[in-house]
């Protein structure tokens, strides 16, 4: 999805497209039309902005001061929160599709991750990743792994 070319630089426009894509992907998986996909919310140097602000996500990662109490950049982090909320909607959609004795989610493995572990430095050390789904019984749910790097 090329947000600038499509004229959807604001998060609201991108979110509407993502939510439509969530439905299409869920149907494609349920109908066994695909088994592998990639969903990207914006390009690496994101030009997305919050409604009412001209500051882009990428600019905020470089220029926004880190909140000392919280330990992160509040405005830049909003973009990650939006992305993860959309991912959660996708996971919930898959969980709502019956398949066999369970759900489509029970038979999938859906990976989500952020581009960086720290927006300001663009570090990938300790990159947060999540996997949802049961992988057809091959994955054990509820496991937290803290990797060293």
For every predicted segment, state its role:
Residues 1-149:
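Ligand-binding pockets and gating/stacking loops
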């Amino acid at each position: 999805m090329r947000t600038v070319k499509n004229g959807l630089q604001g998060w609201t426009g991108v979110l509407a497209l993502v939510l439509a894509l969530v439905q299409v992907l869920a149907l494609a998986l349920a109908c066994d039309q695909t088994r592998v996909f990639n969903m990207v919310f914006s390009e690496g140097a994101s030009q997305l902005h919050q409604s009412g602000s001209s500051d882009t996500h990428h600019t905020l990662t470089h220029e926004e001061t880190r909140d000392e109490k919280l330990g992160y950049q509040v405005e830049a982090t909003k973009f990650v929160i939006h992305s993860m909320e959309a991912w959660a909607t996708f996971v919930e959609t898959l969980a709502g599709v019956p398949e066999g004795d369970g759900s489509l989610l029970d038979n999938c493995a859906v990976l989500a991750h952020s581009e960086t572990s720290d927006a300001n430095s663009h570090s990938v050390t300790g990159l947060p990743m999540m996997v949802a789904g049961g992988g057809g019984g091959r994955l054990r749910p509820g496991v937290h792994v803290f990797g060293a790097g």
